[in-house]
Amino acid sequence: MALTVNPHAGPSAPDTFHEEALYAFRFDLNCDSHEDVTFKVQFGASAQVDGNEHQHVQAFDVCRAIGGVARKGAEGELIISGHTGQVVKTDGDYRAYAGLAPDLFAGDAVALNVFRKALWKEKRFEPQAFQSRQNFFAKANVTAIVIEIPSPLIGRGLVHGWATASLYGHAPEVQVSRWGLPLITHVFLSDPALKDEAERYNRATPADDVTLFSKPISDFTEKVTRLANSAANPSEYANQILARICPTVLPYELDTPAYFNVARFNGRALTDDVMGVILTLATHTALGDGVAPDKQLLRPDFPYFGEPHT
């Protein structure tokens, strides 16, 4: 399991983890959109490495929580402790890494903004927006958290996962970000008339998704397919997409190869072109932005992210 935070870490964003934050990987085992098993990660204060103001190290702990404590708070069984920038291995075949890494996400963010402006302000479908084929995230770094554990510590068979970041320290716990399926706020919840929709989504849970976000997701899909003239019945197609992506959790059959494609979601590999998949599903056309994750930034073994850009 892997999550990344601090886009463009280094020059314009922190290269450390928030010491009053709780990062979590959450798994629903029975399809009720509530977590049953959670892996919680917390970090200590940052310190300079050998007096270098551009390099920092933090201690971190990973806890596994089940049942009621899986949903809230930092409680759980401590399974891994270590320091950032180093791969941590335990006798139980657990591995963890937290630290600077290359951003493996690929997408033309500028083109997506042009596409959305045409859709919402000019009420037209503009696939030509993606002709520039520029990866906005090329040569960017992030801070990554990567954990590898025996799959029985999660469960068996089909699970549904998502990750969250919450403020957690002196103040009460407040969730500020969540990720399950990619690009939900950037594509399906992008209507500028829906103010603060992204923030509302990031503070919600998957159990809230059907109630809170069914209508805007359906409205977006129906609108874009109608403008693109790509669905015989835009309303019916919107309902099909809604059934597939809401709640916005990532399905995965444990111990099988991960892949995220138009036909099916089964986890998500680091090299999957998720921007192209989501654009294709949202518009019901073979639409992509012409860029894909750079496989040269991977390493074959844990933590799978290669060396950060310098």
Predicted feature residues:
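Surface-exposed extracytoplasmic segments
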Residues: 1-310
